[in-house]
């Protein structure tokens, strides 16, 4: 889980559980990609990091580019691409949060029933 604190500057915290241990750490202000420890081998995680670095170098991290990355990144393997389908285990959804001076935008796409929801929280009048 990632926690973002906008009230005390911009601070990111990462809460990880690897199936055995829980860890909380403060993150630096740079880009990160996460892969569920119980679901992916170290080799699969390295591939995902490679795809993420490639995105940064070729398209950058706009909201549109990141959403497209979550839909399409991979090499055609339903076992370890960003959208997985291992039969019994499938990617359920894609969520995105965008913060601007005026609002916080949250979008949620249910990949199972193809529903898309978008909500806004106005930050300043």
Q: Where are the language model's segments positioned?
A:
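N-terminal nucleophile
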Residues: 1-125
